[in-house]
């Protein structure tokens, strides 16, 4: 597909996403609200994105005000939707849940809308990250040339519907993403960055070439069968634990934005029980079981690349 067709599809899908979100906004406002609870987290200021997080204060909002915050949050896709001092590198998060009473017909309509929105989000992510053929260093420029100020992570995040949950409770997850990679995988990634022709701030073009070249040399010196891992810390994330009484089943969802619970109630006793999200305190985290990890040597700090020793 040529570049102009790709750009046209990017713009068409985004226009359709905005229209789909607006349609869902109207559908949700027309439904009877049973309960709503969202938890506002502090905005991340520019320059503080990579600082370790030790404490997150939480501010709860309930009822119609929570519903309005949630609907607004689904549509916050651009930098200009947030304050001037707020980082554009860190996506906004608003964990929580909205509970609506629905008929069979209303449920089908809302499910169709959410499925359509999520499909558009997935297509946009695929266009930007795969079909563009660009390394990550060049995607920012590509996106902001055609959709200036777009916050890609907010755009990619899908909306999660729940059908007749018995309870929704909240907590925090703190973990690493660990991925086994080969020496050839890493060299291919580094060479792609070297040939991209664009430095990553705060490096100048010359500094960037020097850094990548040094990283390539370090990896090339390894034996072919070296066991390599990318072990990248994931910033603490809000999660929701959803319990379904009839199926005797619990499902855990990441919760960067409010879940939407659709309830077909026979009585008030069936109203889902909603939990609170307490403040996060890193010093209070207790691990039930933490297995001994194999010793690792940090090889390329920028990529969180480790050598198993």
From Swiss-Prot:
It is found in: Cytoplasm. The keyword Phosphoprotein does not apply. Belongs to the Tus family. One of its GO terms (molecular function) is DNA binding. Keywords: Cytoplasm, DNA replication, DNA-binding. It comes from Yersinia enterocolitica serotype O:8 / biotype 1B (strain NCTC 13174 / 8081). One of its GO terms (cellular component) is cytoplasm. Trans-acting protein required for termination of DNA replication. Binds to DNA replication terminator sequences (terA to terF) to prevent the passage of replication forks. The termination efficiency will be affected by the affinity of this protein for the terminator sequence. This is DNA replication terminus site-binding protein. Its main location: cytoplasm. It comes from the Bacteria. Signal peptide: none annotated. Gene3D superfamilies: 3.30.54.10, Replication terminator Tus, domain 1 superfamily/Replication terminator Tus (3.50.14.10). One of its GO terms (biological process) is DNA replication termination.
């Amino acid at each position: 597909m040529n570049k102009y067709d790709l750009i046209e599809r990017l713009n068409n899908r985004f226009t359709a996403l905005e229209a789909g979100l607006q349609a869902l906004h109207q559908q949700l406002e027309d439904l009877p609200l049973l309960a709503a609870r969202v938890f506002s987290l502090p905005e991340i200021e520019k320059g503080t994105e990579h600082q370790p997080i030790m404490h997150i204060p939480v501010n709860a909002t309930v009822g119609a005000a929570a519903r309005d915050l949630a609907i607004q949050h689904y549509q916050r896709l651009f930098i200009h939707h947030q304050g001037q001092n707020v980082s554009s590198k860190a996506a906004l998060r608003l964990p929580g849940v909205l509970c609506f009473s629905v008929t069979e017909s209303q449920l089908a309509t809302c499910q169709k809308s959410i499925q359509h929105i999520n499909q558009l989000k997935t297509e946009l992510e695929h266009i930007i990250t795969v079909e563009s053929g660009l390394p990550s260093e060049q995607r920012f420029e590509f996106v902001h040339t055609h959709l200036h100020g777009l916050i890609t992570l907010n755009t990619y995040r899908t909306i999660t519907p729940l059908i007749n949950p018995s309870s929704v409770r909240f907590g925090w997850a703190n973990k690493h993403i660990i991925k086994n990679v080969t020496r050839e995988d890493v060299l291919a990634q580094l060479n792609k960055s070297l040939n991209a022709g664009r430095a990553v701030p705060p490096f100048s073009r010359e500094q960037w070439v020097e850094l990548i070249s040094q990283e390539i040399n370090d990896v090339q010196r390894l034996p072919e069968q070296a066991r390599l891992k990318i072990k990248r810390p994931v910033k603490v994330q809000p999660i929701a634990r959803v319990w379904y009484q009839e199926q005797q089943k619990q499902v855990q969802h990441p919760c960067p934005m409010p879940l939407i619970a659709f309830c077909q109630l026979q009585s008030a006793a069936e109203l889902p029980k909603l939990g609170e999200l307490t403040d996060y305190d890193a010093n209070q985290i207790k691990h039930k079981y933490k297995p001994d990890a194999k010793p690792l040597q940090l090889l390329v700090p920028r990529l969180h690349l480790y050598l198993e020793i």
